[in-house]
Amino acid sequence: MLAKFGLCAVFLVLGTAATFDTDPEEASPRRARFSSNSPSDVARCLNGALAVGCGTFACLENSTCDTDGMHDICQLFFHTAATFNTQGKTFVKESLRCIANGVTSKVFQTIRRCGVFQRMISEVQEECYSRLDICGVARSNPEAIGEVVQVPAHFPNRYYSTLLQSLLACDEETVAVVRAGLVARLGPDMETLFQLLQNKHCPQGSNQGPNSAPAGWRWPMGSPPSFKIQPSMRGRDPTHLFARKRSVEALERVME
């Protein structure tokens, strides 16, 4: 339980600047259309892309529907594939193919509305990870999964969030592996935060919620951030965690 709570701290820190409780369909005018590619262009690209490799996910990049992110995850898996064992190599190949096929098969049903399209991609991603046993792969390939589960170079990345949440649903041992990998990359400050959070135990019946901080701790913005960590993609806010940053920035530009 402590390991899972510690991993939640990663969401807390990485999502602070990117999360606000807004309606996903009204978050920003940018969600109403694609920038470089129209919906028909995106659909055509997806239908013409090969299911093997990262071509399918390249079709999702650079759009105002904020569907960027899966291409980066795909490349991370491919770059680290050689370090996985046989089970892991199979997972890399089959999970990417599963997600690509799932997204392509449902694109025409969902692409007219950004929120529905985003949610569909995340649901397909989570379903493929679960079906192909991402937890077992992470347990038997701790170093390789640690290379994959690193902070993305560009935010927001809602699909990185889905990857982390899929691992967070695993057993304690797997969660501990993911946590250790993130701490190693984020440095001693993250380890200190884990310790602060893990040393603060709330008794049953306490009024303290998950945003309560240990004595002496101050949130950088004066109050804890508001965000959602949801156990399943079913009914999940498609703009969770990192996904809202660009929408908020765009809204601010419009209001200036």
UniProtKB/Swiss-Prot annotation:
Homodimer; disulfide-linked. Produced and secreted by the corpuscles of Stannius. Its main location: secreted. One of its GO terms (biological process) is calcium ion transport. It comes from Oncorhynchus kisutch (Coho salmon). Residues 1-18 form the signal peptide. Keywords: Calcium, Calcium transport, Disulfide bond, Glycoprotein, Hormone, Ion transport, Secreted, Signal, Transport. Belongs to the stanniocalcin family. GO terms for molecular function: hormone activity. It comes from the Eukaryota. Glycans are attached at N62. Transmembrane segments: none annotated. Residues 19-33 form a propeptide. This is Stanniocalcin. One of its GO terms (cellular component) is extracellular space. Its primary function is the prevention of hypercalcemia. Upon release into the circulation, it lowers calcium transport by the gills, thereby reducing its rate of influx from the environment into the extracellular compartment. STC also stimulates phosphate reabsorption by renal proximal tubules. The consequence of this action is increased levels of plasma phosphate, which combines with excess calcium and promotes its disposal into bone and scales.
